[in-house]
């Protein structure tokens, strides 16, 4: 009896309890697997032998599937058990158990939690990957226009990865490093329950432009892939078209389900399914309640790697026609995507969505058992936040409801940033305060902070300094991503490339990008160097603050002994304790080495975010909730959230750390240190911004030494990231002429209001016989929103020589308005202009003695 007959009979036979020995699903799966093997083997073996071999291979394949399912079940149970242990160990600010807060901390970073969260783990896996790409990132890093350097060499990198010898030694080395990163991530994915096969002949990820693929029919797309000669010799090309070869290596493409080469018919079915998935944005692969497809994250991604290109030229031809175009971005995007999935797998097991629901059900059950209305309300809110955080973890909330309107509004936000954040660099001096507080908290020496930052900002040997930072596993977003610097003020956003390039140019030209990256590099290098300086000390001998910081990340004496026994990394005489060197130790069990590596990266990355506050998932969720782009509600929330990310992040980091410290004295010391440092740096930023606007510095103290409370109120808000709101302390309008309601609604709403006033408002005024001031309003809008108009070192010249003259041309009362504005600041704030509105040249120079009340 053949195995096929046994399978059919197994569906008819029953167990003693009356259930079938094989369920319908099991029988159908076994029959499908057998038939696929049989059809492939029949092409090269006689019927009896093909039947026997197909039976053997079917049995082996089904056995492997059972093993894989059981392995994933065990890993899933283990992840769920660990999640429960972690949330039960969590203590809130009062030192009490708090299950609702604890469960949220598994998804988004919470200063009170000592365990790892999915948000931080994503960054950990990203740092593990990019540290091998120092040469590639240094060579290909983005220029001031946001473009990739050496695009042609990136094509050589791809050719080398796919087996073509280009003769470009640097490209070969970069290709080997990138291939190693892809392989490391594949193996890590498989360790956590996945089953991604290794593609022989080299692998480079392919992305698909949905709109480009939609522009051709399914038949045309499959023909483009397979060539005009298709399954069974069927030629589907039009009679007038010349025959053309396909791009994929049909003979050597392996069916992941069978492990054998595809039959032409099966390959065509696979490509048909692939076309449907691309053009439907994966909707054809989705099932209700699943994670981006079939529910189990670990069982995904294997189908992405069955395409085997004939050669690198074939891949590049597809990429130019239907792919993501920019090869560097495709590679970095793949690393980011894999890092996201690896974080979810490590924290929540092979099926993260199931673990999420398990935790929510656990909270619901606890609420039912405790019969406490307040606790039940907290659980309800926590479960809603968990859903929101999970959408951020998976990136589901970035998909616009309407891609057309989502892109339109994202582009508008980019352009607004390019026209309004040109002087944000002057606000970034607050980083010196947060660096100071973060270093003190971790026990790191605070001497020379500014010098180290400026050394990294300097363009001298910029590539070498950056490559060192990457090798140390530090952030390199400014090299690999566009629009990374403004994310600390606006949050992460997806937008059209053209507007993103404009915004990115302003951030780089204004020095905000280099300042932000330099600050993060300086802190990370100092921390790793400080650890290296202390390897001669036992855990108990470490400085108190450093020891407490390490304990917060679950690094105790046992882990520290392993870390300090690791050979230090030497760079021109400077010693560093690198996570990579711990992971590469062959004398440690791999699981132990990887665990300590993760703890060290998690500590460095989290503390760096305290030193240079950046956007956070928790902050984005607080401001935007679970809204998605492309909808009215989502776009209104995106407008509201703009420029508010920094103060919210500050609240979720430093303020939360301060109130979470043990003992009232410790809380007071930390928070007072933070407040004084931020206010001092806020004062510096405010005075710099005033001088950049052409005004003399504002008096900080009167002649008799009394503090100017108007100034210090503004300085405190400036230091806390609320500089725009400082204007509302003493007036109804801010410096942009907006009221509190308009400012709170956000820049997009403000722009729409300006457009309405310029159009509908002027029409109404004209109809009523009133003066319209149309020309003045046009000039005002153009100067307010023109990209790069307020870059801090050019804004004053632009305003005086271009804007003011344009206003004079369209407004006969311009000079009178300019005089009123100068008198207003002198009367209300005691400030004169050193280069005032309407003046052709500076009348004075900034008088720094004004700061202390001297005239």
Residue ranges and their predicted role:
Residues 302, 306-426, 430-712:
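Hydrophobic, often aromatic-rich secondary-structure segments at membrane interfaces
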Residues 420, 427, 431-438, 634, ...:
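Short hydrophobic helices that act as membrane-entry/anchoring signals
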Residues 214-343:
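Long, charge-dense tracts
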Residues 654-777:
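Short low-complexity linker/loop segments enriched in small residues
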Residues 2-184, 198-206, 210-215:
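Low-complexity, small/polar and acidic-rich linker and loop segments
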Residues 162-194, 416-438:
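Extended amphipathic alpha-helical scaffold segments
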Residues 192-208, 443-456, 657-665, 763-777:
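Short linear, low-complexity motifs centered on an aromatic residue
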Residues 764-855:
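Hydrophobic alpha-helical segments
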């Amino acid at each position: 009896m053949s195995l096929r007959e046994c399978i059919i009979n197994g569906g008819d036979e029953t167990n003693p309890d009356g259930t079938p020995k094989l369920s319908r699903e099991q029988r159908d799966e076994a029959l499908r697997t057998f038939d696929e093997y049989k059809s492939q083997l029949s092409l090269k073996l006689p019927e009896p032998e093909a039947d026997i071999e197909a039976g053997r291979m079917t049995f082996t394949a089904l056995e492997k599937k059972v093993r894989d399912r059981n392995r994933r079940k065990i890993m899933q149970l283990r992840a769920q058990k660990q999640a429960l242990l972690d949330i039960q160990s969590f203590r809130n600010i009062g030192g009490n158990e708090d299950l609702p807060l604890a469960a949220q901390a598994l998804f988004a970073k919470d200063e009170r939690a000592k365990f790892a969260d999915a948000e931080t783990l994503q960054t950990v896996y990203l740092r593990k990957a990019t540290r091998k790409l120092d040469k590639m990132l240094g060579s290909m890093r983005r220029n001031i226009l946001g473009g990739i350097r050496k695009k042609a060499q990136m094509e050589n990198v791809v050719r080398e990865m796919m087996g073509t010898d280009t003769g470009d030694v640097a490209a070969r080395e970069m290709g080997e490093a990138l291939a190693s990163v892809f392989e490391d991530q594949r193996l890590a994915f498989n360790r956590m329950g996945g089953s991604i096969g290794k593609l022989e002949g080299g692998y480079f990820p392919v992305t698909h432009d949905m709109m480009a693929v939609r522009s051709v029919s399914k038949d045309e797309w499959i023909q483009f892939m397979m060539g005009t000669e298709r399954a069974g010799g069927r030629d589907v090309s039009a009679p007038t078209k010349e025959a053309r070869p396909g791009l994929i290596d049909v003979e050597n493409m392996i069916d992941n389900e069978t492990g054998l080469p595809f039959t032409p018919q099966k390959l065509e079915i696979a490509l048909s399914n692939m076309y449907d998935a691309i053009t439907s944005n994966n909707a054809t692969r989705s099932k209700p309640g699943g994670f981006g497809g079939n529910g189990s994250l670990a069982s995904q991604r294997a189908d992405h790697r069955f395409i085997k290109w004939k050669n690198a030229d074939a891949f590049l031809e597809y990429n130019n026609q239907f792919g993501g175009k920019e090869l560097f971005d495709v590679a970095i995007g793949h690393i980011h995507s894999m890092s996201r999935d690896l974080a979810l797998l490590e924290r929540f097991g092979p099926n993260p969505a199931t673990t999420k629901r398990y935790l929510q059900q656990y909270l619901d059950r606890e609420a039912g058992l405790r019969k406490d209305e307040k606790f039940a309300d907290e659980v309800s809110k926590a479960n809603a936040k968990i859903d929101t955080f999970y959408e951020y973890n998976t990136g589901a909330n970035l998909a616009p409801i309407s891609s057309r309107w989502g892109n339109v509004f994202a582009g508008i936000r980019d352009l607004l940033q390019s026209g309004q954040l040109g002087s944000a660099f002057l606000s970034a001096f607050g980083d010196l305060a947060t660096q100071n507080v973060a270093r003190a908290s971790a026990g790191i020496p605070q001497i020379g902070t500014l010098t180290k930052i400026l050394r990294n900002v300097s363009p001298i040997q910029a590539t070498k300094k950056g490559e060192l930072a990457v090798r140390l596993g530090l952030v390199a977003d400014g090299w690999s991503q566009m629009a990374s610097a403004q994310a600390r003020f606006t949050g992460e956003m997806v937008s059209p490339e053209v507007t993103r390039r404009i915004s990115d140019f302003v951030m780089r030209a204004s020095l905000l990008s280099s300042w932000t990256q330099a600050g993060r590099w300086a802190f990370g290098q100092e921390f790793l160097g400080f650890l290296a300086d202390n390897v001669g000390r036992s855990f108990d001998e470490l400085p108190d603050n450093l020891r407490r910081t390490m304990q917060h990340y679950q690094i105790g004496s046992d882990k520290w002994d392993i870390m300090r026994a690791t050979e230090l990394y030497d760079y021109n005489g400077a010693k560093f304790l690198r996570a990579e060197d711990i992971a590469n130790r062959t004398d440690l069990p791999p699981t132990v080495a990887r665990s300590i590596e993760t703890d060290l990266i998690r500590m460095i990355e989290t503390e760096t975010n305290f030193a240079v506050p950046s956007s956070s998932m928790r902050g984005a969720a607080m401001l935007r909730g679970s809204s998605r782009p492309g909808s009215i509600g989502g776009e209104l929330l995106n407008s509201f959230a703009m420029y508010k990310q920094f103060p919210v992040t500050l609240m979720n980091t430093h303020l939360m750390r301060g109130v979470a410290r043990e003992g009232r004295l410790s809380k007071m010391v930390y928070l007072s240190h933070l407040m004084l440092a931020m206010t001092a740096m806020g004062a510096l930023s405010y005075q710099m911004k005033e001088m950049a606007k052409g005004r003399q510095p504002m008096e900080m103290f009167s002649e008799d030494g009394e503090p100017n409370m108007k100034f210090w109120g503004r300085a405190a808000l400036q230091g806390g990231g609320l500089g725009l709101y400082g204007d509302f302390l003493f007036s109804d309008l801010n410096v942009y002429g907006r009221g509190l309601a308009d400012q709170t609604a956000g820049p997009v709403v403000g722009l729409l209001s300006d457009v309405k006033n310029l159009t509908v408002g002027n029409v109404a005024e004209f109809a009523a016989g009133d003066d319209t001031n149309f020309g003045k309003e046009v000039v005002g809008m153009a100067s307010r929103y023109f990209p790069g108009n307020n870059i801090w070192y050019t804004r004053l010249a632009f305003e005086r020589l271009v804007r003011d003259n344009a206003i004079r041309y369209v407004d006969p009362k311009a000079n009178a308005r300019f005089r009123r504005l100068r008198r207003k600041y002198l009367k209300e704030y005691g400030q004169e202009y050193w280069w005032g509105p309407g003046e052709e040249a500076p009348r004075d120079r900034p008088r720094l003695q004004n700061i202390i009340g001297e005239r």
